[in-house]
Curated annotation (Swiss-Prot):
Skewed-composition ranges (Polar residues): 255-269
Organism of origin: Arabidopsis thaliana
Matches recorded under PANTHER family: CERAMIDE KINASE, SPHINGOSINE KINASE
Domain DAGKc: 160-367
Name this polypeptide is given: Ceramide kinase
Biological process according to GO: cell death; ceramide metabolic process; regulation of programmed cell death
InterPro entries: ATP-NAD_kinase_N, Diacylglycerol_kinase_cat_dom, Lipid_Phosphate_FormReg, NAD/diacylglycerol_kinase_sf
Length: 608
């Protein structure tokens, strides 16, 4: 650095206010001299060295485009001082490095430096967030410190960001790399000055027990609860929190809904002109009590029902935000809420305080087996509940845990070859859109077992208008927003290869579009998928459509698909097994209902 050039590093402010504009000349590592500016929502910089930015030197290589570059405060997770050291000249391609080495070496200088840490979206995968660091150098230490103070002040104003987190790590999740995943991302939390209390689970149900027993006073000292594991581990933590706190009326039992059902034998969609049996909302819509105090059938920590509220674990309107760092076998929840199955991306969503709300499904088991007495038992699911094929796969997979995630492919093939079907009865509350959709189904002349109907699909994305249309969960009480005044229940009975209820699309590596491509994260609906008994080739075609991007897995005659807020299930076999977010759930009779926007989550939704 030559003497007499200190004026190039002067900083000047357009406003005395901390929120006002601020500009100054700095050297950006590997770029060159830039004019750095701070405005109300972020940083921007513009190259000042024409020899670097115009691309007229070093054989015409453009080192830095002559345009402004920026990063928003909402995308910055840390600013740190990195002491006195080298600020490098612009990066060069290998072909030209030798020719320009001597010239660029002269421009490499030592100065005081600070680094702005943020992220950049991958050009090919916008949902994938890559760590990015921008190091700025200046000859004056006080100037660097002043800029750091200003930037940190701006970050403090990002009020949604967590400062203290309770982290559960499942060391054996997925391929058994839960601890390694946390070790990788924990460095980002440390750099962002986020305090973490880490609990590495030692047994099944460990996280559930901690969440069920922790006092709300202690829970409120944390800004969020983080799971490092898979969907099943997230389910365990969620149930530990909700079962001891959430008090809402239960959904109708199968016998209750039968009294108000419009029965049509094996057809669950009424034809145009049919008489519609409507019921009053107070009778059959379970989530609209007359008052906050009018609740029924509460449950204890173990899921059984009682009528006594636990005073040590009331359900707070200020619910903790949950987060999930993927380390599981499928990681469908992360795929649906961030768009990427990437621990670093999920960690950044958490640190930067991204927020959305997820629907949750309350599942009530009335009977375990056909000979059991009626005894309500409650669980919650954040993504999926499945019976038949799905239940058989999760049940059989327990024998092959030593295989890791590959066990699902192996067991799935075995169950497919067995081609078992189950006799059952399903009743569901019909959504308003079902009435018009029912009259539109027509048969394809070329493929008699496929439907020709193609409806416009509105996919769930970041800042989704459908999910943000209204908040489903009333933060002032444990009630939901008003629902339609009248509801209609329909019944379908027969033999099924599988029955699935999806809360979200459930995208994963085996089903890139998910079970229902246009399912939303917080629209207040369950997506009921009934696969009726059919030949093995037809079922294989359905699974093939499910496994490819742009497929139509629901467009078959033997597939019934309904959007609903609640449904009931009764098996005609001796026993039945359900898959609840990847966990085994035995239920001969069950009911389920959606709770809109119940779960606050550190995520922003997929970008594309």
């Amino acid at each position: 650095m030559e003497e007499g050039r200190d004026d190039e590093y002067c900083s000047f402010s357009n406003s005395g206010d901390r929120d006002g504009g601020l500009s100054g000349c700095f050297f950006l590592d590997h770029v060159g001299q830039v004019l750095l500016s701070r405005n109300h929502d972020g940083l921007s910089w513009k190259c000042l060295d024409s020899s670097d930015c115009e691309g007229t030197t070093c054989l015409g290589i453009i080192i830095c485009e002559n345009s402004e570059t920026e990063i928003k405060f909402s995308d910055i997770y840390a600013v740190e001082f990195v002491s006195y050291g080298l600020v490098h000249s612009p990066k060069l391609g290998l072909r030209h490095a030798k020719e320009c080495f001597r010239e660029r070496l002269l421009n490499t200088q030592e100065m005081y430096r600070f680094t702005v840490h943020g992220f950049q979206s991958s050009p090919k995968e916008p949902c994938l967030w890559n760590l990015a660091a921008f190091t700025f150098g200046h000859m004056d230490l006080q100037t660097c410190q002043s800029w750091m103070d200003q930037l940190n002040y701006s970050l403090i104003k990002e009020v949604e960001r967590p400062r203290n987190l309770l982290v559960f790590v499942h060391p054996k999740s997925g391929k058994g790399n839960g601890s390694k995943v946390w070790e990788t991302v924990s460095k980002i939390f440390i750099r962002a000055k986020v305090n973490t209390k880490v609990i590495v689970t030692e047994r099944a149900g460990h996280a559930f027990d901690v969440m069920a027993s922790i006092q709300n006073k202690e829970l409120h000292t944390y800004d969020g609860i983080i799971a490092v594991g898979g969907d099943g581990f997230f389910n365990e933590i969620l149930n530990g929190y909700l079962l001891s706190r959430l008090k809402v009326p239960l959904p109708p039992s199968p016998s209750d809904s039968f009294n108000s059902v419009q029965s049509r034998g094996s057809s669950s969609v009424p034809e145009p002109g049919d008489e519609v049996h409507e019921t009053d909302q107070k009778e059959h819509y379970p989530l609209l009590p007359d008052s906050v105090q009018e609740v029924m059938n509460f449950r204890t920590v173990n899921g059984s029902c009682e009528g006594i509220e636990d005073p040590d674990h009331p359900f707070s309107s200020e619910r903790p935000r949950f987060g999930l760092i993927p380390a599981g076998s499928t990681d469908a929840i992360v795929m649906c809420t961030t768009g990427a199955r990437d621990p670093v991306t999920s960690a950044l969503h958490i640190i930067l305080g991204r927020k959305l709300f997820l629907d949750a499904m309350q599942v009530v088991r009335w009977k375990t087996a056909s000979t059991s007495t009626i005894e309500p038992y409650i669980r919650y699911a954040a993504s999926f509940a499945g019976y038949g094929f799905y239940g058989d796969v999760i049940s059989e997979s327990e024998k092959y845990r030593w295989m890791g995630p590959k066990r699902y492919d192996y067991v799935g093939t075995k169950i497919f070859l067995k081609h078992r079907s189950y006799e059952a009865e399903v009743m569901f509350e019909e959504a308003e859109s079902e009435n018009s959709k029912a009259s539109l189904h027509t048969r394809s002349k070329t493929w008699p077992f496929r439907n020709t109907t193609r409806s416009e699909k509105i996919l769930c994305r970041a800042n989704c208008k459908i999910c943000n249309s209204k908040v489903g969960w009333n933060s002032a009480s444990t009630t939901l927003n008003p629902c339609p005044e009248k509801t209609r229940w329909c019944r379908t009975k027969g033999r099924f290869l599988s029955i699935g209820a999806a809360v979200m699309s459930n995208r994963n590596e085996r089903a890139p579009d998910g079970l229902v491509v246009d399912a939303h994260l917080s629209d207040g609906f369950l997506h009921l998928i009934l696969i009726k008994d059919c030949s093995r080739p037809k079922y294989l075609w359905h699974l093939t459509e499910l496994a490819k991007r742009g497929g139509e897995p629901l467009n078959f005659e033997f597939v019934e698909y309904h959007k609903t807020r609640a449904f009931t299930f009764t098996s005609f076999g001796e026993e039945s097994v359900w898959n609840l977010d990847g966990e085994i759930f035995e239920a001969h009779q069950l009911s389920a209902q959606v709770l809109r926007g119940l779960i606050p989550l550190f995520a922003s939704g997929p970008e594309i």
